[in-house]
């Protein structure tokens, strides 16, 4: 069983690997579109970059701090998808001056993926320092808030639609120990994006912005290997969050604007919940359940 598969969920089917419905029949038209991914050089972010490249976007921009992983990601993407332009920006998402400059230099962006996150030491809350907590909130919440604001102020792309995809975590809603800063900051970030989503619905311009948060899955990384053996759980495939993000960027997901989702949830079952989602503003959001 997958690490979080036993958690309550709105769908019967729980995917640990990608599947044709989102990998081949996602409904997203990448023609002429530009995608900006923070943290897109490795891990989940790179999985998302590959999926959008496969979907035929014209340009993928990657923002991260380290040059070497960026160059490796660029080389891999251009080798596999020679028609896709890959642009690199070496910067920290916490730089509230540089990030708006990057948006200006890049031009209109169709899809913004908030993929950078800070994860502190896996220690009890009493052992985590104030600075570690601040670092988590500075990157996971404040930087996401500032970049979302800056993106909303940019001109609409030719497609007439902006999409913001926030890479969240199960830690935002599932009780996990030794994750005081990470879990609480991810929950706060999801709440921030929910506020943006509700306010965008009230804009008189027909809501040309769609906003989603989603848990990408559980992956066997070197950090995870310090606490679990590989055979202890069934780990998710990194292709899953990439293809799920592309599906979110397509037209079928519009009714899920402002919701907190999991890549593991079956998209056809989610579509079957459309009326409930539209009627219950709190359904699939981060908040108090009574």
From Swiss-Prot:
GO terms for biological process: secondary metabolite biosynthetic process. CDD domains: SDR_c (cd05233). SUPFAM superfamilies: NAD(P)-binding Rossmann-fold domains. InterPro entries: NAD(P)-bd_dom_sf, Sc_DH/Rdtase_CS, SDR_fam. Signal peptide: none annotated. The active site is at 168 (proton donor), 182 (proton donor), 186 (lowers pka of active site tyr). NADP(+) binds at residues 37, 149, 182, 186, 221. PROSITE patterns: ADH_SHORT. Coiled coil: none annotated. Its EC number is 1.1.1.-. The keyword Cell inner membrane does not apply. It comes from the Eukaryota. The keyword NADP applies. Short chain dehydrogenase/reductase; part of the gene cluster that mediates the biosynthesis of the tetrahydroxanthone dimer neosartorin, which exhibits antibacterial activity. The two different monomeric units appear to be synthesized by the same set of enzymes, among which the Baeyer-Villiger monooxygenase nsrF is the key enzyme for the divergence of the biosynthetic routes. The pathway begins with the synthesis of atrochrysone thioester by the polyketide synthase nsrB. Belongs to the short-chain dehydrogenases/reductases (SDR) family. This is Short chain dehydrogenase/reductase nsrO. It comes from Aspergillus novofumigatus (strain IBT 16806). The gene is nsrO.
